[in-house]
Amino acid sequence: MIYNSIYEMVNDIDPPKLPVIVPTHNNPAYLKMMLGQLDKYGLDDVIIIDNFSLYPEMRALLKEISDKYIVVSKFTNEGPREFYTNPLLFNWLPQKFIVTDPDIGFNPNLPSNLIEILEKVSEDFNLFKVGFALDIEFDGNESIKKIMPWGKTIYDWELAMYLNQIGETSSGDPIYKAPLDTTFCFVNKAYDNGDFLYTSTARVGGNFIGQHYGWYENPPIPEEEKEYLINNAGRWSSTSNGGNSG
């Protein structure tokens, strides 16, 4: 099913019990990768919110997968936080759901009951969002050691995310109180305090540490797609829209 707006979708269907929101913009290889990872964990109630992609390969993919997934193909780019900033969408979603950027690689040791674990962390610590910590020691991480517009490197910023451990999961993975944007996260509306990024969020390390391929100099996507992303500078990014956390 393809919708042309959030309004059209919310007025036509009820939300799935545990939807997975995947915001996209001209990144078909990442979306295919993410859908494969989600399928492996039985997370198939996916809602793809596409932010006005014009890349032909992306348009073709959205059409191809619309028989299996809900696709909202919008004519505007509101960025990956629209699930929160758009009251119509946020109020339509159930109390608990998942959000993930498409360029996140799952840890090969990620447990099969990851949602159960993240939900328990949310309930135990009264957290709005609980998600993956991010790997900053990957090969070629010089790409995140450059000074960014806010005066720090991504590496230094992310290193600070590992300083405040508040507990462990039942399987011994450390839980860190840290800012969290739209990397893979479990969302619990019961603990929304109006602060999207900072005060009601945590990251889980250990076997939950994921790869953020958007940081890579040579990400696992076709060269043509990489060039398209580089040459279309209008793309939304957290670093230019009020945040710099994963």
PLM features per residue range, with description:
Residues L110-K129:
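Conserved donor-nucleotide/metal-binding helix-loop-beta segment in metal-dependent transferases, i.e.
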Residues I2-N4, G151-G246:
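C-terminal catalytic/acceptor-binding lobe
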Residues V130-K145:
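Short beta-strand-to-loop element that shapes/binds the nucleotide-sugar donor at the catalytic cleft/hinge
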Residues P56-F97:
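Active-site-proximal specificity loops/subdomain of glycosyltransferases
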Residues M1-G36:
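N-proximal low-complexity "stem/linker" segments adjacent to membrane-targeting elements
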Residues N26, L38, N51-S53:
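Conserved short acidic donor-positioning loop in nucleotide-sugar-dependent glycosyltransferases
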